[in-house]
């Protein structure tokens, strides 16, 4: 719904980190951090989001953040702004993305870039590839009323979802082919 905030409950980057691990280019602490992130259940986060009147929610998995956001925006017929600098990411992700180490699912997830209205201006941003990174046991992406977003975030942090953050907002109703504007 227009005016709502987009909350992501877990950090991104499992795809690139495990691709790096398979190439023996990931540090042990990076993999350990990713595993800790993955074993955290989404159950309490889902309950918290529900208690804060979320109107739409999905898990972020193999299609990556952008793939799931495109599906959410199209199903809800809304446009959103996504703040790329606010994306939470796991230790080692900046390094693996800089080395252009991607999951085998990454190339097919790139087709979701058609959902970005200002795609051309962002392709060189260091976090751009993270938008397409497939997640294993990823977090939840939810749309929460603006007046409840900060309380929801505090509650998520108290429940142990330390990386939970607001990554964007719903700006208008629409049925555009490219419903997502990325802010950097």
Label the predicted regions:
Residues 1-184:
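Helix-biased detector of long, well-ordered alpha-helical tracts
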């Amino acid at each position: 719904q227009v005016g709502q905030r987009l909350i992501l409950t877990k950090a991104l980057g499992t795809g690139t980190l495990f691709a790096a691990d398979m190439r023996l280019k990931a540090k042990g602490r990076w993999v350990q951090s990713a595993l800790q992130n993955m074993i955290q259940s989404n159950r309490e986060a889902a309950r918290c989001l529900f208690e804060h009147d979320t109107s739409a929610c999905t898990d972020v998995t193999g299609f990556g953040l952008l793939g799931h956001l495109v599906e959410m925006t199209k199903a809800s017929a809304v446009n959103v702004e996504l703040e790329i600098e606010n994306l939470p990411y796991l230790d080692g992700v900046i390094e693996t993305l800089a080395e252009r180490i991607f999951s085998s699912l990454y190339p097919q997830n790139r087709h979701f870039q058609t959902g970005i209205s200002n795609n051309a201006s962002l392709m060189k941003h260091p976090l751009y590839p993270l938008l397409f990174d497939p997640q294993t046991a990823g977090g939840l992406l939810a749309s929460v009323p603006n007046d409840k977003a900060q309380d929801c975030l505090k509650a998520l942090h108290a429940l142990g979802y330390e990386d939970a953050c607001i990554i964007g907002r719903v700006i208008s109703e629409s049925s555009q082919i490219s419903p997502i504007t990325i802010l950097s």
